[in-house]
């Protein structure tokens, strides 16, 4: 089965986890940014999981260097463009890129400039390739609540211009959703769609709270609903799509192998599974690689692929017209 040739959809891809390593080097040299190595083969060890990783927190350390080169409008635009260029080459037809604007203010850019630069890169790629992209704004859970309000308020002017949703991301603590009720209430009033990272690092109850307290329409990862019957039942009853990222889940030690990952059990039980990369560079992966691994180790069939693709179409934060276009690729 040639997954490379099949059309694909990416709903969970972090911009700062998906930079080309040669771009990091190029920008660092241009902007005089210190790196631990200026050799591409050595630098990759600092931005990708090459051998082993013991936790989500250790995984998140790989973002430090990429964010250093994402502090100017020019660089943000370039990096967004290159991401869409790369996924278009993998036959991805639609992508929702997510990033946290407040990680890119070190050199004085404001939130509006940051969002605008990323949107410019996305739109430039759309002109050249057979791909459409939208943007999800992330609020970092290790920042204070006023920071989250700031992202929601300042990003709202871009809703309908490429920004489609809000997300909470970063390290996951038990019962975090309770802190963000007012933030997400405001986001919903502005018209943001809502996806929340939850149930990635062992706490299935967070998925329950993300849906009940924050009105999450999709869940980033969500794999630990397997340990919370109430969350599992709610996800199934409400048809809440899960943005599953298998290789990333292995890297963060959520599971030991593809074979023990619960995605196939979820799929067979009609949970709305979508398959995504999470971070193409950090996890050294593509959507094609994800599908190939699931085919090799879990018996993913062409019928399963089509189910996942159509789940992704329905879950996408895009227009009815765009969804019709995406469905035609597999009809």
Swiss-Prot record:
GO terms for cellular component: cytosol. NCBIfam families: aden_deam. It holds the Pfam family A_deaminase. It is an enzyme of class 3 (hydrolase). Substrate binds at residues 14, 16, 170. This is Adenosine deaminase. Binds 1 zinc ion per subunit. The active site is at residue 200. InterPro entries: A_deaminase, A_deaminase_dom, Ado/ade_deaminase, Metal_Hydrolase. It comes from the Bacteria. PANTHER family: ADENOSINE DEAMINASE (PTHR11409:SF43). CDD domains: ADA. Zn(2+) binds at residues 12, 14, 197, 278. Signal peptide: none annotated. It catalyses: adenosine + H2O + H(+) = inosine + NH4(+); 2'-deoxyadenosine + H2O + H(+) = 2'-deoxyinosine + NH4(+). Belongs to the metallo-dependent hydrolases superfamily. Adenosine and AMP deaminases family. Adenosine deaminase subfamily. Catalyzes the hydrolytic deamination of adenosine and 2-deoxyadenosine. GO terms for biological process: adenosine catabolic process; hypoxanthine salvage; inosine biosynthetic process; nucleotide metabolic process; purine ribonucleoside monophosphate biosynthetic process. The record marks 221 as: Important for catalytic activity. One of its GO terms (molecular function) is adenosine deaminase activity.
């Amino acid at each position: 089965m040639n997954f490379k040739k099949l059309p694909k959809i990416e709903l969970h891809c972090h911009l700062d986890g998906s930079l080309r390593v040669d771009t990091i080097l190029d920008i660092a040299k241009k902007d005089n940014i210190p790196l631990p190595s200026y050799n591409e083969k050595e630098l990759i060890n600092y931005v990708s999981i090459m051998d082993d990783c013991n936790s989500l927190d250790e995984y998140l350390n790989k973002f430090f260097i990429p964010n250093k080169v994402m502090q100017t409008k020019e660089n943000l635009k370039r990096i967004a463009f290159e991401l869409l260029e790369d996924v278009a080459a993998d036959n991805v037809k639609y992508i929702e890129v997510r990033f946290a604007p407040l990680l890119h203010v070190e050199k004085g850019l404001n939130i509006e400039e940051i969002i605008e630069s990323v949107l410019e890169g996305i739109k430039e790629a759309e002109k050249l390739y057979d791909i459409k992209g939208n943007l999800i704004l992330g609020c970092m859970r290790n920042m204070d609540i006023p920071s989250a309000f700031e992202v929601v308020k300042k990003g709202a002017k871009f809703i309908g211009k490429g920004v489609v949703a809000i997300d909470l991301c970063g390290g996951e603590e038990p019962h975090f959703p309770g802190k963000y009720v007012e933030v997400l209430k405001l986001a919903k009033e502005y018209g943001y769609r809502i996806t929340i990272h939850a149930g990635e690092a062992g706490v299935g109850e967070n998925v329950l709270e993300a849906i009940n307290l924050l009105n999450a329409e999709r869940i980033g990862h969500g794999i630990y609903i397997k340990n919370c019957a109430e969350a599992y039942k709610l996800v199934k009853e409400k048809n809440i799509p899960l943005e599953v990222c298998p290789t990333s889940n292995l890297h963060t030690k959520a599971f030991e192998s593809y074979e023990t990952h619960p995605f196939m059990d979820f799929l067979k039980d009609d949970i709305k599974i979508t398959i995504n990369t999470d971070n193409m560079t950090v996890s050294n992966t593509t959507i094609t690689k994800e599908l190939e691994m699931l085919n090799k180790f879990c018996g993913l069939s062409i019928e399963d692929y089509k189910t996942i693709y159509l789940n992704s179409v329905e879950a996408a934060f895009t227009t009815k017209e765009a969804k019709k276009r995406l469905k035609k690729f597999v009809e």
